[in-house]
Amino acid sequence: MKRLGLAALYIGSALAWPEPHGPPSRNVPRDDFPMFNPLPSTDLNTRLIRCEYPSMKGWTYSNKKNGDWLKYVGSKPGEITEYNIDTDNDKYVPQGITRKYHLEVTDESVNMDGTMFDQAKVFNKQYPGPWIQITVTNKLKHNGTAIHWHGIRMMENMFNDGVPGVTQCPIPPGSSMTYRFKASQYGSSWYHSHYSLQYADGLFGPMTIHGPTSAGYDKAVDPLLMTDHLHSSAFEEYHKELEGKPPAMDSIILNGKGDYDQTGDLKKKYRTVLKPGKKYLLRLINTSVATTFVFSIDGHKFQVVGSDFVPIEPYVTDHIAVGIGQRYHVILEGLSEEEAKKNGRYWVRTTPAKGCSKFAPGRGTDDRTGVIYYNKDDGVSPTTEIGAFSLDCRDEPLEKLVPKVKWTVPDPGLNMVGAFEKPADVQLGKWHRPGYPDTDNLVSNWEFGPSPMWINYSEPIIKNLDKDSFPSTWVVYPADDYVNDKWVYLVITGKKLKPLSSQVAVAHPIHLHGHDFVLLQQSMEPWDSTEVNLKLDNPPRREVTLLPAGGFIVIAFKPDNPGSWLLHCHIAWHASAGLALQVLERKEDLKALTLNNPDFDFMQENCRKWDAWHSDKTNYWNPSGHFQDDSGV
């Protein structure tokens, strides 16, 4: 994973690999460059990663006192000679190495429960597989933070889902939190802050979990992150959403590069070189604030082999609409040598979908955000044209998204008629924000029916499981009376919205935490419970889908993961304005998971730290104002 220059927060990662399967030691003289092990774990069976800085000749590891890290001992000192706890890492960061971790999938004999199992499939010859841990250190001044690992199921592990006010209190400035989870899925996704509008300011990055694909390829290309960008902080622009006039984005970015002035300067474009006749895996990730993109490469077609974290039967297309939070794995087949000689340069396009974007006047019109060259990057601009295809804001056709692993969903039958009569309606309204004087002007809000979401950072629901009821602004939907062989069915409608109005996108990207859901029906027509036509035999499966404004979706999931799972619109302005709810799944089982659980204990300690920080108003950006001005998520 390459650093794309998108993060506004220092994220340090430490991966714990049980012996004997840790990264191998490198046979390099210790005085050549800094190379050392961090302080060992208290668990003697765990070995931490080795820290390596091969480009930092003349530096050495320094541990004379607490807080030391690196010290320059060479003969040509530069601007800085030490990296320690007092170093401003907004300005100075030691240059380490790019790390890649590989998992081997093998057949093994494993004794899990006292009986030998001869047909086990395991990672790195061990069961369970290697344990991944990520430590996040908050060095912001006026904000807490929490990091969400988008699409990771967090099976029986709600504590690490990273949603402040739901799964944890925010990490206060000066504190750290280690997220622990098992990667049981594979594909590509992203991690991002779920604290208010932080990710809109750049707090996100890509992640890939390697695994099989449903079609072959020769090489993989780095993750392609397509996003929209504001030149001012989203926190400063948010008032426009409250006033009914959503902020306009300034430019389109692909992998950290954009051309705001739309000059066509190739230095401002993403560029890569391909070989004719080779097949390349592209990992497409939409990390936008408010834009659905249509991805294409002039003159090329590709096979789609995965949607979100779900491998699918391959199909061929020349373009693909990618909603916010959605991901696709596609395989691009390079042109033949003869074709490549005729024209060795092609535009990569991330085109804003019709009705699902808003840019400042004259901005966001140049969708040529990248170039692929054949054999050599000669620095010359392509002259290719965009293909003749639809730029509508809609999901890929459901009949094309066929999961490789087939699921058959039970027919909800007559028992669900009552539930189908009470769908969750996406509504646009006005309200007085909690904690604000009633004399304040009404502001715009979004909601899934009963109330806009407005969480309490100091009282996440995980701390309040003994309560029988919750504040209406927490928007809690209980899912208690289910067992593993039953399903939860949800109908979400946008029937009260008017598409293409000043504040309504043509489609809302709806994301569910903690689960893959099946998409049983999706329509641009108004919801009518008497005309239900569900696809129950191997329906599309993912965790983000587009809800058409004026239409509806019917989704379902297995209630096999106790937790309180956020369901929200991934248009950042809409989530901040309240368009979210939480599904409280199997509350009693969730309570049992909190017993003797170090993650639950850490959550409580982190909340105490948060409360101490939050109680001092001098820590606020505006000490005399309101600390919270949006939903919190």
Swiss-Prot record:
EC class name: oxidoreductase
InterPro entries listed in its UniProt record: Cu-oxidase-like_N, Cu-oxidase_2nd, Cu-oxidase_C, Cu-oxidase_fam, Cu_oxidase_CS, Cu_oxidase_Cu_BS, Cupredoxin
Chain residues that bind Cu cation 4: H508, C569, H574
Superkingdom of the organism of origin: Eukaryota
Main localisation: secreted
Keywords of the record: Copper, Disulfide bond, Glycoprotein, Metal-binding, Oxidoreductase, Secreted, Signal
Residue positions assigned to the propeptide: 22-47
Subcellular location: Secreted
Descriptive protein name: Laccase ARB_05828
Species name: Arthroderma benhamiae (strain ATCC MYA-4681 / CBS 112371)
Taxonomic path: Eukaryota, Fungi, Dikarya, Ascomycota, Pezizomycotina
